[in-house]
From Swiss-Prot:
GO terms for cellular component: cytosolic large ribosomal subunit. The keyword Ribonucleoprotein applies. GO terms for molecular function: 5S rRNA binding; structural constituent of ribosome. This is Large ribosomal subunit protein bL25. NCBIfam families: bL25_bact_ctc, PRK05618.1-2, PRK05618.1-5, PRK05943.1. The gene is rplY.
Length: 208
């Protein structure tokens, strides 16, 4: 599991006015909550978070939050608020992580070997990814940044379901898998081209 460090400082002033001043200074108001400790208000460097939030790992990995240069605190991103039209992160929520408590996290799917699969090499075939992430349950030490879905044997007309995915050891779906919840993940099918040319009416062009 990769180590992703985020630097932060404790925040003394709270409220809308204080948050507005922070943003003008290039900082982001944020909070850490969860566990047996009280919530802690912190501030983050906007540039650091703006770059981090463009990466997949920021949303699905355990983050090492370094507050005031002290020891890192293990957290998960739980909420990130963006400005509706400006390139600004407005607020961030982090949840503390306990090493012995299972997490429920959305983990992205990475599809491999699609181009070399029988369906990928066939002409006139569309391969659709119905899901791009799955919610899993696991201990923090077992949390993967992503789960690979191998499409090397995908053939035309084939559907890959959740039950076909191989999950890492210690990782399982958050919801119980049965026939009703065994969702399609990938579908490979031929493209159907409809003929939109209007049929000629009977007798059209006939001369009397």
């Amino acid at each position: 599991m990769a180590n992703h460090q985020i630097k932060a400082q404790r925040r003394k002033d709270e409220g809308k006015g204080a948050s507005r001043r922070l943003r003008h200074a290039g900082m982001i108001p944020a909070i850490i909550y969860g566990g047996e400790q009280r919530p802690v208000s912190i501030q983050l460097n906007h540039e650091q978070i703006w770059l981090a939030q463009q990466n997949e790992w920021f949303y699905s990995s355990i983050l090492d939050l370094n507050v005031d240069g002290g020891g890192g605190e293990k957290v998960l991103l739980r909420d990130l608020q963006r400005h509706p039209y400006r390139q600004l992160v407005m607020h961030v929520d982090f949840q503390r992580v306990s090493s012995d408590a299972k997490l429920s996290v959305a983990v992205p799917l990475h599809f491999i070997n699609q181009a070399t699969s029988p369906a990928g090499k066939a002409s006139g075939v569309v391969i659709t990814h119905e899901l791009n992430e799955v919610h899993v349950s696991c201990l923090p030490k077992d949390l993967p940044e992503f789960i690979e879905v191998d499409l090397s044997t995908l053939s035309v007309g084939h559907v890959i379901h959740l039950s076909d995915i191989t999950f890492p050891i210690g990782v399982e779906l958050s919801t119980r898998l049965d026939k009703e919840h065994d969702m399609a993940v990938v579908i490979a099918k031929h493209v159907v081209i409809e003929d939109d040319t209007p049929a000629e009416e009977e007798g059209e062009g006939d001369t009397k």
